[in-house]
Amino acid sequence: METNEKSRVLDMTRGNPFRLVLKFALPLFFGNLLQQFYNLADTAIAGHVLGDHALAQIGAVSALYGLITNFAFGMNNGLALSLSRSFGAGDEQKMKHVSCWMVTISMSVSIVLMSIFLLCKEPLLILLQVPEETMAGAMEYLTIILIGIPFTMAYNMEAAMLQAVGNSMTPLLFLLFSSVLNISLDYAFMAPLAMGIGGAAFATVLSQGVSAFLAFILIWRNYPLLHFKGKDYQVEKKFVLEMVVAGFSMALMSAIYNIGSVILQGSINALGNLYITAQVGARRLAELFHTPGLALGTSVATYTSQNMGGGNRNRIKKGVWSAFFLFAVWWIFSMVFVTFFVEDAVRLVTGSSNADVIYNTALYLRISFPLIPTMAVIIILRNMLQGMNHLMMPLVGSSLELIGKVIFAIWVVPAYGYFAVCLCEPVTWVVCCIFVLICAFLCRKELR
């Protein structure tokens, strides 16, 4: 294992796979955990200061916001796969080419996304069946979030660049700063300044913008391998096309999953504010316990890409098994939590004293948590396949998740209510887990 102390890069082509995956995943885990704690704090502040109605306003558009952020995350992680392979191969000139086009593609897409969503926001909220009494606040919150899309994309791009060269610690430090700033601004905007639900959105956009700016300064000062000039645009069209395909493949994979969540959110909105509030609390807590799977998935993607680039394919299976073991340990802790402490956590996060809200939030978690390991298998193997440059298989897997959520949203939830919402993800996880396991089995010979 070789690290450069100045830039914190991590060469994952040499050394113990378990230690490498763990070392890279830990900062990602704490970063994701920090992000989820921020989301919990954001929800708790809104719930305690503004009440259940504010939670319903945020919850009504939370799936749409998740679609945007996960598209940005997927796009930049896909673009960064080329950077990881170039780093693993020691090709410094190619790294500059990748950085150049990564910035161009990412920021261009952010402007297009912002424009499209701003033009379509009102029809989208109508399609989501947002209740009339919630519409005005949801519209205000969403508008501010959409204006901040370029900041969201920029920060995700810079974090992906750093992670591609093995540095998962610096993005954690920026996320720590962003979260502390965000929580402070949340309270200031919603309580003393009485900016209402718009204050929560503005705090998010402002903190992401500041973090993106500071990350840019750090990369410019300390990472000459990521610097580029005008001449670095001069590459073969095939090179750019490969980056675009990888970026949009991972973005679409994330987007397809989240489109299903948006459609499902529409069916939840139709159930009324009580279930919207229960769902936002349930998702905040569920996502907190999903964080190790996401961190390990990103670690496996970087580990796989670097070892593919370095010609060390036989090391990849060891890294994947290490990731499975680490998640199994976390799952045991998760089951202890959901068995003994879930109701208290719901009260803390939502600030709600409504017995029906607490019951339905806890029900969602108790049904989904036993099957979280299937979600981890999906994420880890999907990232392994992407690191091996198999882009269609994960995309098909995400499409299966979309189909499952559409079926539940259109037919099952209207018939069986919120109980069907609780069953939706576990059922789709099992189906997609089987598919991804088959894909990994078919690709096993490439790892010899």
PLM regions: where:
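N-terminal transmembrane alpha-helices
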Residues: 12-49, 63-78, 82, 107-114, ...
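Transmembrane helical elements of multi-pass membrane transporters/channels
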Residues: 23-42, 144, 178, 207-211, ...
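Transmembrane alpha-helix boundary and packing residues in multipass membrane permease domains
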Residues: 28, 32, 44, 81, ...
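Helix-terminus/linker motif at the lipid-water interface of multi-pass membrane proteins
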Residues: 37-56, 125-132, 188-195, 255-288, ...
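Small-residue-rich hydrophobic transmembrane alpha-helices
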Residues: 55-115, 152-171, 265, 279-342, ...
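Short runs within selected transmembrane alpha-helices of multi-pass transporters and secretion channels
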Residues: 76, 145-163, 171-179, 200-213, ...
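Short alpha-helical transmembrane segments in multi-pass integral membrane proteins
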Residues: 1-25, 83-148, 192-248, 304-371, ...
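Hydrophobic transmembrane alpha-helices of multi-pass small-molecule transporters
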Residues: 67-70, 182-186, 212-216, 288-291, ...
